[in-house]
């Protein structure tokens, strides 16, 4: 786990060499840097989200006016430590803005949460995020990125697992990024019936 001084600007660690946390770049700090770079959109397709630091970065993106769409596995919405419902409620925090406008957040699941189908279906096991892809390839910019890998957005992944996280960016990678973007949009349309309700 990285020291707070690596994550929070202007925070000074007073423990010095006695600090038990990492003072070097980690998968988590790398992921947070990418999320914090978002200017227009975050399209997140994630099996599980239980790492508060990541959820906080997504919430901060919403406050900056970034449009956020999340697709997740219905079985994990209410799993121990899940941040999905809390993030979903941020969609109601932007009074006067609908999802179709430039900011806000919406969560869709691969099945209705709590249904029999939810308990017996295969998992939606993706772990990728598209940054500043906008509505399509014509909107790609120098800040457009794809994050993908085995890295779950969980405390377990941050503290214990051996995982990988790859980031693709730049025009040379736009074809691969576009493949993931199209896949995300297909799932987004497919799961339209399973929008996670708010205020529950």
Stretch-by-stretch model annotation:
Residues 45:
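Short alpha-helical functional segments enriched in proximate histidine and acidic residues
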Residues 1-37, 48-57, 64-200:
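HKD-type phospholipase D/PLD-like phosphodiesterase module
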């Amino acid at each position: 786990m990285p020291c707070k001084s690596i994550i929070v600007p202007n925070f000074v660690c007073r423990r010095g060499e006695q600090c038990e946390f990492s003072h070097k770049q980690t998968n988590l700090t790398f992921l947070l840097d990418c999320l914090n770079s978002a200017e227009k959109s975050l399209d997140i397709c994630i099996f599980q989200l239980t790492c508060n630091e990541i959820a906080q970065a997504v919430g901060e993106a919403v406050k900056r006016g970034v449009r956020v769409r999340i697709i997740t596995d219905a079985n994990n919405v209410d799993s121990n430590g899940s941040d999905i419902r809390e993030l979903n409620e941020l969609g109601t925090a932007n009074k006067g803005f609908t999802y179709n406008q430039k900011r806000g957040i919406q969560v869709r699941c691969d099945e209705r949460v709590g249904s029999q189908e939810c308990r017996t279906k295969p998992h939606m096991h993706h772990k990728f995020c598209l940054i500043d892809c906008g509505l399509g390839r014509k909107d790609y910019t120098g800040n457009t990125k794809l994050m993908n890998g085995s890295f779950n957005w969980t405390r377990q992944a941050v503290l214990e697992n051996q995982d990988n996280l790859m980031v693709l960016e730049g025009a040379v990678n736009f074809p691969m990024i576009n493949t993931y973007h199209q896949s995300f949009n297909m799932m987004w349309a497919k799961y339209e019936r399973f929008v996670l309700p708010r205020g529950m």
